[in-house]
Amino acid sequence: GGLEPFEQRLIEGMRKNGYDEQFARQIFQQILGFGEYGFPESHSASFAHLVYVSSWLKRYEPAAFTCALLNSQPMGFYSPSQLTQDLRRHEVPILPADAVVSEWECTLEDVRGEGGGEEQPALRLGLCLVKGLSQAGGERLVAARRAQTFADVGDLARRANLNAHDMQALAAAGALSSLSGHRRHALWDVAGVERMPALLDAAPIAEAQPLLAAPSEGENIVADYASLGLTLGRHPVALLRERLQRQRMFTAAELKALPHGRLARVTGLVTGRQRPGTASGVTFVTLEDETGMVNVIVWRDLAERQRKELLRSSLLTVYGTLEREGEVVHLIAGRLRDQTPLLGSLITRSRDFH
């Protein structure tokens, strides 16, 4: 903005150079329009406004902020797993995806007491996060449930007209727990519905549910990541913490208290790798454990020497030197170690070089 005082000067100059006045005024109007957004001040102001609004929402309405981000996926730098882990670290309750309660999108549920204060509503995960569940099937499920609550898994499959693929996706994600119990019972019930002849679709199932052992904590976490891309159980690194403590690994939270220049080692899930074109070959790696995030700087020479560990690790240990500038903490990597085998069959995803 602020270009109006230059209008007459520009028009007169263009006329002296052989352009007619109408064309000169048209050019000025185009420049005027560009001036509304095209100069550093305008860019800075608009970006600062977005940052301020986002920061305010994250600080004062974290449940609603995260809910909106989850419903906008896929987008941005942070995955659903990172978003939900951050929300849990801020002690906002998150409720699981549940065919008996969840909408297609994530929603908020008021679990606040009458005491007021800064309590947040709970975030209810939506069926949209269930991998393999079609949107059409999920929306039919929600519509059928609004008409009448589901009596059992067979009733759900029948009235929502879900195919075997959709039902298996719900069972694998633990979204049938309110009707069947744990995942193994849900998968058994779904298999029974699939085997039911069409003639007997509406007949009640009198067969007793078998006594199947519940999955272990680790098995549930593996299934969570496979079916939802996130877990509401313990963070995978938390299951390894006792072992990591014996290796004298710091947590992300503990790193923040260490002094500048301290040698440190940390292990976390790799959530992102970035190598900006302006960074002279430096790679930035983000690690996550049960206490937070760790920003790691890998210089070019180390990246070239340990390319395999840098690019292929899902669980990475970094030995390095802490660099602190005020509240900002980085770990300058000196050595990398691939710890992915400790995850077993757990498969995680990272956002790399976007």
Could you tell me what each predicted segment is?
Residues G1-H354:
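Noncatalytic, beta-rich nucleic-acid-contacting surfaces in large DNA/RNA-processing enzymes
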